[in-house]
Amino acid sequence: MPPSDEAMIRHFTTHEAAFRKVYEIMSESSEGSFHYPPLSPEEVIILDSTEQSDTSHETNDEQDLPVYGLLKPDRLLLDSLLSEIGCGLVLVDRREWETADSVYVSLVMPYYSHGIVDAGTSKSFVYDPGLESRRNIRITEHGDLNEIYRRTYNDTTLYKPVREGWYIELDHSR
């Protein structure tokens, strides 16, 4: 049974500083669109033993290779923050417009998941300051998302506002 919206809002409020810190790190220190932590070993460069012995005079921080622009101290902090907020990963979507010299970053942090890829239910914390301006997005402030989905029991994606730019997302597919 997915957590209620009320329980997720309480959880967000309790850990709001950690959620905001995740956003700060991802928006200011990372590069590109990606999953963190990396989903496969191929996404991370690991030095072989020859290269490690060649750099043995360097400290661990000097040997650190950025992963999506994130240095080791940021990754360690992110690991700690994700553990605190109970989310196993962050999906980062970054869009850059050279003409406007601006960057748009949205985050999805899965909090609950049940089922398989093609059929299941998930609830996530989402940061997306432009969500309300998108077409075909269903946002509701009334009722629990779980109850709304149970009444229709169709494939659905619903959002509920939590704070400015922050939402709960319920995604269900059969």
What residue ranges belong to the model's regions?
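N-terminal export/targeting and maturation segments
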Residues: M1-E84
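Extracytoplasmic electrostatic interaction patches
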Residues: S83-R174
